[in-house]
Amino acid sequence: MRILPVIDLAGNVVVHAVAGQRDAYRPIESMLAEDATATAIGSGFVKHFGASEVYVADLDAIGGDEPRWELYRALAATGLRLWLDCGLASEKRAALLQKATEHEPIISRFIVGLESVKSPQEIRSILRVLDAEQVVFSLDLRNGQICNAHDVWLEMGAEAVAATVLEMGIRSIIVLDLAQVGMGRGVGTLALCRTLRDMSCEWELIAGGGISHLENLSKLEQVGCDVALIASALHDGRLTSEKLSAAGFSFP
């Protein structure tokens, strides 16, 4: 199983995401860097873990602001390609992202988050612009429930949402309970991850939220996960490069 480090951006700094309460996020304090700037944290991931990719959640863009390309470019200049979560929820934004990266391949994957899209039709419109291979769908939950206010999603349930996305041709899915992020209590979506793996062996299954120890990673691997998203435990030293390597976990 691979490890994908996570950067949550708010303003111009990397913040410590806790339980999805974004208004309360504060700049990250990290053993990997002297400050909380994106470039310092990105450089820390490269230096200490040999990372070549990073998941970037631009919380301002997710909230409706424009993507911040200068910041993304600066982060990419540290040696990282980005899995970018910037509120991609429409064909228009997909076209803007495609145009912005056409001659500058700093983005490895584009994230479509369930919390941002109103309906399955919006995802289909995005796929008219972006190849399905470029897209990762994030099955966003909060305390085990669908994290979306629109009835079309709420009526489906998590497994049906995942099946719908699979039918569209998307082959990478993140299972993330926002209430568990940064809490260090372990991943609470193991049963759902196992169900999704049983549903299909075709997709890349990614999970995160609450990972703090090697045991958490082993459990994710046992239920069929391919990639684990981690932030806090990398910053505070609970999971070091040496520990992860010795246990057989690698960075992309």
Region locations from a protein language model:
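N-terminal active-site wall of soluble small-molecule enzyme domains
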Residues: F45-T101, T189-C193
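Catalytic cores of alpha/beta
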Residues: R81-I106, S119, S125, A191-V227
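C-terminal helical cap(s) of enzyme catalytic domains, especially alpha/beta-barrels
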Residues: I123-L127, E221-V223, V227-P252
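Short, acidic/polar
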Residues: A33-K47, E91-L96, W153-T164, L217
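Conserved anion-binding
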Residues: A10-E29, A95-V181
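Hydrophobic faces of well-ordered beta-strands that scaffold small-molecule active sites
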Residues: R2-A10, V54-V56, L82-C86, F110-V112, ...
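Short, small-residue-enriched loops and turns at beta-alpha junctions
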Residues: D60-D65, S90-E91, G144-I146, A179-G186, ...
